[in-house]
Regions:
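Short, histidine-centered active-site or binding-site loop motifs used for metal coordination
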Residues: 12-14, 45-47, 144-145, 202, ...
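Short helix-capping/linker segments at secondary-structure and domain boundaries
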Residues: 38, 103-107, 140-147, 251-260, ...
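Conserved nucleotide- and phosphate/pyrophosphate-binding catalytic cores
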Residues: 22, 154, 160-334
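Internal, conserved structured core segments that host functional sites
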Residues: 114-166, 170, 190
Length: 334
């Protein structure tokens, strides 16, 4: 607890451009959480280097992601918005937690198997111990809740296991985090393969709408979206392409599926795609305008980065010093 509020931690990697799915499914919902929680939102750039990155590109993407956090409406006075790499406690705690994590637990992580298959030429130790760094990210701030998707639930369970194991040995040190169950954001699927989630790493550039895509690009991608041969606009699982377009339309305009279906009754797929494209362009314009404004104010962004890193380090040190003392490290001389 901080300021009588439960603590919430979440973060995104700076390895690509955020998609409409990231925005509607997560980022848009983060904005309201600071009323109920003390929120830590990280640009998790340390996780990014488990796959080779061009240094200049990584720095550029990290800054762009932090700018998007702010443009989306996250208040840096109410939330702690920071680069993971600017808080040394993440790496320090991760090393200690490595010593309380079993090889067998890490071997069972499905994401390691998936990522190592995709990057067979670079199966490094960091990729293997990625879930331990994720555990450190969460436990460092004594997070009570963590918003996670199904693909990250296994990592959160490992985090809980590590925290409980450590507490059983040394006493009540870590808060054991729970999965955040709140307002469910829209689940946006690929425009080219509606059976899989819209992803910033999609090899098909037409499958994802990126938050900084210009209007012409957005309209073109929507027009090329996969549909079916039913020639009927209905919200049902049997028509995943149409259902996905309706989900996007509803999420952008705050409508229900029933309202959207009635609106497009008797119309063709072309009109639906046009309507979806226009809805996305309209929904993203305020965000894009705010990004453009923030990017011009380098001094302001730099001040946010500095102040929030210091705030995060302050809370991180409170946990880290306690953990270091518990495991037997010598106390620092002040």
């Amino acid at each position: 607890m901080i300021n009588d509020k439960k603590v919430l931690f979440s973060g995104m990697q700076a390895t690509g451009n955020l998609t409409l799915g990231n925005y509607l499914g997560a980022l848009k919902n983060w904005v309201t959480l600071s009323d109920e929680y003390e929120c830590f939102y990280s640009v998790v750039d340390m996780h990014s280097i488990t796959v080779r990155q061009d240094p200049a590109t990584l720095r550029k993407r990290a800054r762009a992601l932090l700018t998007l956090y702010l443009a989306a409406g996250l208040d840096p006075k109410k939330n702690c918005i920071y680069y993971q790499s600017h808080v040394s406690g993440h790496a320090e705690l991760a090393w200690i937690l490595n010593c309380f994590t079993y090889m067998g637990e890490l071997n069972r992580m499905t994401q390691f198997k998936d990522k190592s298959a995709k990057h067979a030429d670079n199966i490094n130790a960091g990729l293997f111990t990625y879930p331990v760094l994720m555990a450190a990210d969460i436990l460092l701030y004594q997070a009570d809740v963590v918003p996670v998707g199904i693909d990250q639930m296994q990592h959160l369970e490992l985090t809980r296991d590590i925290a409980i194991r450590f507490n059983n040995i040394y006493g009540d040190v870590f808060t054991v985090p729970e999965a955040y169950i709140g307002k469910v954001g829209a689940k946006i699927m690929s425009l080219q393969d509606p059976a899989k989630k819209m992803s910033k790493s999609d090899e098909n550039p037409n499958g994802s709408i990126y938050l900084m895509d210009d209007p012409d690009t957005i309209m073109r991608k929507c027009k090329r979206a996969v549909t079916d041969s039913e020639a009927c606009i209905a919200y049902r699982e049997e028509q995943p392409g149409i259902k996905n377009l309706l989900d996007i339309y509803c999420a952008c305009l705050g409508k229900t599926p029933d309202e959207a279906v009635r609106e497009f009754e008797g119309k063709g797929y072309g009109e639906l795609k046009l309507g979806v494209g226009e809805a996305v362009v309209s929904a993203l314009k305020p965000l894009q305008d705010e990004v453009a404004r923030l990017e011009k104010d380098k001094a302001y962004l730099d001040s946010i980065i500095k102040e929030n890193a210091e705030k995060a380090q302050y809370f991180a040190n409170k946990t880290l010093r306690k953990v270091q003392h518990k495991v037997g490290f010598s106390d620092r001389i002040r």
